C-alpha cells in the first residue's frame, strides 16, 4: 500500500458538497461494512473534476467500477478482508473529513511477517510465520490523503468509538495491458 495526495483542497470540498447532496443510505451490514452510511454519486456527479483527479491517477486501470462514500459513525467498522474479486485491480480510499472528537476508525492492514532470521539472543516458541499475514498495522492518514492498494492487501477499519470519519472509496479494474 501507499499514501498519496491525489486531490487538492478545492476538490476535497467539492467531494464534501457531493456527499452532502446525496440521500443517506444507512446499512447495518453491507458485506464487510458494518453500521455505515453509504452514498453513491450519480453518473453526472462522477464526471466532476474532483472525481476525475482520482480517475486520472488510476488511468492505467480499467475504469469499470464506480465511486461511493462511506461515513463511519459510532460503532461502524469494516471487517478484515481482501478485495479478491478477480475484476478489482486497484482500490483508492480518500480520507475526506473527520470530527474533532473522533476515536477509532483507523485504516488497518494485516501485513505479511517478513523477518527471515531469528535473533540468537531471544528465545522463540513455534514456527516463524514467514510471509503469512499476521502483522496488524494502523495506517495513519491525514484528511485529504488517499490510501492506494491492490486486491491482495488484507485491510479493514477499526470500530469508531466516538465521532465520525468520511471517506470516498474508488474501485478500478485490472491493469490495462
Feature annotation, model-predicted:
Residues 1-62, 77:
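Non-heme Fe(II)/2-oxoglutarate
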Residues 60-177:
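Catalytic core of non-heme Fe(II) oxygenases with the double-stranded beta-helix
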Amino acid at each position: 500500500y501507499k499514501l498519496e495526495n491525489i486531490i487538492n483542497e478545492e476538490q476535497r470540498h467539492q467531494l464534501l458538497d457531493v456527499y452532502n447532496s446525496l440521500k443517506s443510505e444507512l446499512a447495518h451490514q453491507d458485506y464487510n461494512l458494518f453500521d455505515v452510511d453509504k452514498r453513491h454519486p450519480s453518473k453526472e456527479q462522477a464526471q466532476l473534476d474532483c472525481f476525475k483527479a482520482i480517475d486520472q491517477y488510476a488511468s492505467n486501470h480499467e475504469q469499470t467500477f464506480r465511486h461511493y462514500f462511506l461515513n463511519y459513525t459510532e460503532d461502524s467498522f469494516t471487517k478484515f478482508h481482501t478485495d479478491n474479486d478477480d475484476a478489482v485491480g486497484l482500490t483508492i480510499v480518500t480520507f475526506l473529513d473527520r470530527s474533532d472528537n473522533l476515536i477509532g476508525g483507523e485504516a488497518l492492514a494485516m501485513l505479511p511477517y517478513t523477518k527471515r532470521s531469528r535473533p540468537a539472543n531471544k528465545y522463540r516458541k513455534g514456527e516463524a510465520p514467514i510471509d503469512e499475514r499476521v502483522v496488524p498495522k494502523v495506517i495513519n492518514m491525514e484528511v485529504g490523503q488517499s490510501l492506494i492498494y491492490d486486491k491482495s492487501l488484507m485491510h479493514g477499519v477499526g470500530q469508531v468509538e466516538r465521532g465520525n470519519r468520511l471517506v470516498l472509496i474508488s474501485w478500478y479494474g485490472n491493469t490495462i495491458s
